[in-house]
Each structure stands twice: as C-alpha cells, then as structure tokens.
Amino acid sequence: MKKVLVIAMAALFIMGMASCNGNNATSEETTEQAVSTDSIEIKDNLTMGREFLAENAKNDSVVQTESGLQYMVLKEGTGAKPGPTDTVTVHYTGKLLDGTVFDSSVERGEPASFPLDKVIPGWTEGLQLMSEGSHYRLFIPSELAYGSKGAGDKILPNATLIFDVQLIKVDKQK
C-alpha cells in the first residue's frame, strides 16, 4: 500500500513539474502575443488616423495645410496672431478619435500658457493660423503630434489627435 502511495505521489509530482514547465512556455507565448497585439494596435492607430483624415478632408469646412494638419474655424478672432516663439494663453480640449478626452484646460477651469516652440508641431503650426479671440478645431496627424512614441498611457503611439482651441492672448517674443 505504501509502495502504491509513493508511486502515485511521484506521478503527481512529475505531472505537476511538467505542467509548470508548460506554464513557462505559455507565459512566453502570452508575452509574444501581447507584443504582437501592441504592434497591431499601433499600426491600427496609424491606419485609423489616415482614414479619418482622408474622410475629414472631404468636409467643406475643413482646411488642410501642406504638412497634413487640418483645421476648422469655429470662430474667427480679430486680435494679434502669434509667431513661432511667442507665448500664447489658450483654453483647449484634447480628444482621441474615439472621443475620449485626454486633457482639457476647460475642465480644469484655468487657461494654459506656453511658448509655441515648446509644444507639438501641430500646435505650433495651427496656433499661428489663429488670431486672438479665435476658436479652431485642429485635426493633428500623428507625425505632427507624438508620433510613434505616444505620450503617457492615454495617447497611444501613432494617434491622430483632435483639439478644440480658443486663443485668448498672444505675448509677443521680444
């Protein structure tokens, strides 16, 4: 009886070890699948962004610049226009293509101020088109935003971004 018990325990031990070894392979496979899924998601972001911008360009109220930046004038202002190194004060809401808000000075209740040469290229270009008092919607392709790196955990690599921007004030660089 003891001999049968020892053999049964040895068999269970061997089966347990074999299943643990199999779990390591499964973990490796899971990691490879996650990396593969991330690559697909990154590629999909780029594809979805390009498809969105191509369709968006058909809208009569959307203007596309040579760089690929698109914008829509919601309200035209009459004040000063910023240069590439001027500091601007704005209210803005940034969204992903699915409508998820990732940042908003409007929600914080306080406008943001920054030099235009310290932001993403889509902002530097887009805000120079605006006059104080303007309200534009900017459609920024990933290469004019955060590109293949993304930003934080909300803006994935290759994400096209949409910003509603109100230009409140321009402080000219001296």
PLM-predicted stretches and their roles:
Residues 2-174:
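Cross-family detector of peptidyl-prolyl cis-trans isomerase
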